[in-house]
Amino acid sequence: MHSLLGLLLVFAGSTFALYLLSTRLPRASTLVSAEESGDRSLWFPSDLAELRELSEVLREYRKEHQVYVFLLFCSAYLYKQSFAIPGSSFLNVLAGALFGPWLGLLLCCVLTSVGATGCYLLSSVFGKQLVVFYFPDKVALLQKKVEENRNGLFFFLLFLRLFPMTPNWFLNLSAPILNIPIVQFFFSVLIGLIPYNFICVQTGSILSTLTSLDALFSWETAFKLLAIALVALVPGTLIKKFSQKDLRLKETSNTHSLNSRKVT
């Protein structure tokens, strides 16, 4: 009960702080209406139309209030990640539209890692009992898999991020229960989600620069789409290669054990 109350207090305080940050907007002379310039709050996008509208508003704000937009974006991203709220993919796309493909990618990778670690810490302090109570079977299954791969835990965590057998938010919540070291957890998120973040950020960068259908078929856009395809395919190829190698090792060890039994 005390853990739940503490978590609710932290959540309420963070929500209120983000609310103040998104409603006390500085006025921007580049925005034409008073409604756009400060008499309305910003919002989390729920579809591509809202995402595009929000992107246009924030890009106008960024011309005069670059630091404020940066702070607002980081706060919103960490809020979603720390409290395991779905929808970070929209923020990744927004990062590409606001900050460009490479700065956006770097920012999303860092924020994803910090936010996931925040979720780890909140779960460690407030949520262990709640997670075990509501998801006992999932925790038990994941615990078994982690223990089976304890010797190569970091690479197993990378595998889970690249090809999640369980949702990322649940892995963030259950990691302290599974005794996953926080340093390994942080860097597995930082590295393992690079392909996913890259795809989302590049998508946002492309969408923000398209002004007509002709621009969709430009060489620059074609190279970006090719890069997205390669990043999506390479991790799967590498994981498949390492999985086959591991399978051969297992087969070899099984053969040795069978031969030793025949000898005895």
Swiss-Prot record:
Residues 1-17 form the signal peptide. It comes from the Eukaryota. The chain crosses the membrane at residues 67-87, 90-110, 153-173, 175-195, 219-239. Residues 96-207 are annotated as: VTT domain. It is a multi-pass membrane protein. Its main location: membrane. The VTT domain was previously called the SNARE-assoc domain. As there is no evidence that this domain associates with SNARE proteins, it was renamed as VMP1, TMEM41, and TVP38 (VTT) domain. This is Transmembrane protein 41A. It is found in: Membrane. Keywords: Membrane, Signal, Transmembrane, Transmembrane helix. InterPro entries: TM41A/B (IPR045014), VTT_dom (IPR032816). It comes from Bos taurus (Bovine). Belongs to the TMEM41 family. GO terms for cellular component: membrane.
